């Protein structure tokens, strides 16, 4: 068959295969056109997952008769001139969307420009244009697409169910709405209640309002503002506190010069920034906005324009990591704002009848006048068994028995319940602390600080502890011996299937070396060899901190509890343990009063 020029309709359908993959692609292209037209409100309607009908209405600048004539021709655009390909400032620029859509569907465009006496309408079916005719429209543009892919029936077989396609459309609109909080959006159709997002005020507060409307109240309550800037590149936005996580990275959004993009860059950068706060199987929710000179980023990577290429990707990644780490450190003592309130709201007073029971006869009830009954005695009259000598605990040297700690952020310790939780009284409520989670964070931060200064202090074991392990585990530990020694853990091979532990970190006190080594070996087996040394060392520190912390079930003396609270107040990131769980929750007196009907 000789080489020949393909007909224009066939060329457009081939191009449509890249630009119009599914109904969500159509919505994306049309909404981006509305944004580029300066719209302040965009209304979206879909039916049948976008297959049967898609309608986009905006109040933007509209098109003149001449512009409308060219708008459905390939590579005809008002957004680009001969020199601008490396300095793209609009969402669309290729001039392919409308002709591609018109080649595979029934397309109708009604538009009015301020310079025109009335609106104009144009219809395209399967690539064939109808004459432009006068129409009725006050201003802006209305685009309707029906019978998508009717001209290419084979494409219909690759679409998902209406529900799946509708959800893909909603996700596209959500991302565009997050990128432009200054524009009002509405979505209707698909037998769902209409969704409307009002235009938000300029600035960070308005952006957070829009993000909260889309990502939910939990995100709004736990959002941390972040920002970092260098060499003309600005990274800003909001990141959720470590206590708000998801099982996947779908809650991580990146916007570059107002364009929603999907980039593996953000996943790696966010994981690095949150490495001190979250377990490996949890992912935070973040929305980051990158602003830079348009000549420093290439948006012409793919026809769908969902990918970009940075001239200096390393700088962008470093700024993302710095912005997130700085924000997390600044809010390090913050707990999940919604946790305590949600729990309190679920409490209900119980009026169920009780069996006859004489509480005065209970052997645990102290009789008035006895030594155990002393309302004023408090902790001072109680005897509690403390830690074993040498066991790690909070530093009690700064504890002041006579001091009133209720004015401190974490208050004054009042009791310990279930030998696991410390209850402290603050000026306007109470705080409940998970003693293991809190101490784990303290030990971890001390290990990191020691590593950054003079190294971790070691304690030599008089008798080396021999730990029996399988040979693969022994090889793994010995191979990482230098990294372990950095943290004061010195191990040597001790014949087949065993290692000798000769030194341990002083900070851990008396620890179960066997359990620690098995845990470390398990984590090492999951490490990628490409994992940076710093990340590997942090994993080691986190594992050691977990093993070297106060365990649940240990009775604490009042001075130890108060010392732990004071250390938490002076330690960065003490609001979460190394696994992302909150170390404490705070209940305001007003919440407690509501629980008992006093408010």
UniProtKB/Swiss-Prot annotation:
PROSITE patterns associated with the record: DNA_MISMATCH_REPAIR_1
Coiled-coil ranges per UniProt: none
Keyword Magnesium part of the UniProt annotation: no
Keywords, ordered alphabetically: DNA damage, DNA repair
Matches recorded under InterPro entries: DNA_mismatch_repair_CS, DNA_mismatch_repair_MutL, DNA_mismatch_S5_2-like, HATPase_C_sf, MutL/Mlh/PMS, MutL/Mlh/Pms-like, MutL_C, MutL_C_dimsub
Keyword flag DNA damage: yes
GO cellular component: mismatch repair complex
Cystine pairs: none
Molecular function via GO: ATP binding; ATP hydrolysis activity; ATP-dependent DNA damage sensor activity; mismatched DNA binding
GO BP annotations listed: mismatch repair
Family that this chain belongs to: Belongs to the DNA mismatch repair MutL/HexB family.
Its job: This protein is involved in the repair of mismatches in DNA. It is required for dam-dependent methyl-directed DNA mismatch repair. May act as a 'molecular matchmaker', a protein that promotes the formation of a stable complex between two or more DNA-binding proteins in an ATP-dependent manner without itself being part of a final effector complex.
Protein name: DNA mismatch repair protein MutL
């Amino acid at each position: 068959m000789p080489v020949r020029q393909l007909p224009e309709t066939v060329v457009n359908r081939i191009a449509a295969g890249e630009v119009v993959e599914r109904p969500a692609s159509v919505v994306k292209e049309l909404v981006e056109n509305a944004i580029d037209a300066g719209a302040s409100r965009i209304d979206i309607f879909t039916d049948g997952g976008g297959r049967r009908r898609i309608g986009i209405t905006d109040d933007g600048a509209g098109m003149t008769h001449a512009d409308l004539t060219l708008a459905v021709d390939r590579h005809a655009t008002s957004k680009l001139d001969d020199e601008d390909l490396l300095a793209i400032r609009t969402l669309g620029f290729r001039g392919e969307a409308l002709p591609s859509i018109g080649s595979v569907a029934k397309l109708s465009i009604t538009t009015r420009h301020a310079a025109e006496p009335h609106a104009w309408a144009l219809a395209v079916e399967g690539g064939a244009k109808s004459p432009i005719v006068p129409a009725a429209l006050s201003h802006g543009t209305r685009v309707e697409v029906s019978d998508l892919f009717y001209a290419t029936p084979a494409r219909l077989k690759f679409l998902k169910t209406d529900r799946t396609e509708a959800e893909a459309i909603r996700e596209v609109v959500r991302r565009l709405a997050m990128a432009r909080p200054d524009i009002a959006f509405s979505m209707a159709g698909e037998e769902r209640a209409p969704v409307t997002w009002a235009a938000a005020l300029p600035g960070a507060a308005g952006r957070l309002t829009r993000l909260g409307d889309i990502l939910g109240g939990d995100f709004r309550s736990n959002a941390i503002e972040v920002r970092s800037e260098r060499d003309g590149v600005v990274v800003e936005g909001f990141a959720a506190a470590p206590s708000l996580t998801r099982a996947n990275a779908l809650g991580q959004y990146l916007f570059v010069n107002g364009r929603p993009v999907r980039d593996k860059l953000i996943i790696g950068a966010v994981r690095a920034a949150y490495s001190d706060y979250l377990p490996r199987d949890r992912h935070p929710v973040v929305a980051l906005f990158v602003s830079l000179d348009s000549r420093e980023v290439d948006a012409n990577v793919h026809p769908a324009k969902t990918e970009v290429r940075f001239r200096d990707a390393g700088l962008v990644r470093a700024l993302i990591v710095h912005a997130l780490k700085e924000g997390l450190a600044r809010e390090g003592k913050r707990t999940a704002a919604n946790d305590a309130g949600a729990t309190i709201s679920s409490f209900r007073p119980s009026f169920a009848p009780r069996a006859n029971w004489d509480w005065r006869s209970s052997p645990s009830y102290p009789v008035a006048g006895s030594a155990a009954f002393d309302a004023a005695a408090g902790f001072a009259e109680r005897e509690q068994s403390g830690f074993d000598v040498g066991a790690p605990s909070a530093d009690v040297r700064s504890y002041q028995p006579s001091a009133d700690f209720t004015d401190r952020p974490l208050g004054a310790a009042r009791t310990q319940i279930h030998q696991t939780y410390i209850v402290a009284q603050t000026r306007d409520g109470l705080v409940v602390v998970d003693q293991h989670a809190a101490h784990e964070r303290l030990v971890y931060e001390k290990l990191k600080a020691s590593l950054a200064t003079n190294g971790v202090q070691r304690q030599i074991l008089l008798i080396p502890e021999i730990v029996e392990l399988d040979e693969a585990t022994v090889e793994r530990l010995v191979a990482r011996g230098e990294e372990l020694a950095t943290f004061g853990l010195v191990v040597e091979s001790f014949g087949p299937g065993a290692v000798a532990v000769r030194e341990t970190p002083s900070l851990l006190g008396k620890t179960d070396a066997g359990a620690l080594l098995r845990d470390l070996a398990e984590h090492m087996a999951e490490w990628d060899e490409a994992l940076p040394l710093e990340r590997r060392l942090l994993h080691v520190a986190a594992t050691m901190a977990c093993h070297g912390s106060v365990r649940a079930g240990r009775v604490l003396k009042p001075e130890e509890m108060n010392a732990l609270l004071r250390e938490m107040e002076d330690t960065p990131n003490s609001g979460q343990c190394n696994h992302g769980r909150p170390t404490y929750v705070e209940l305001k007196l007003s919440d407690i009063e509501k629980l008992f009907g006093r408010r």
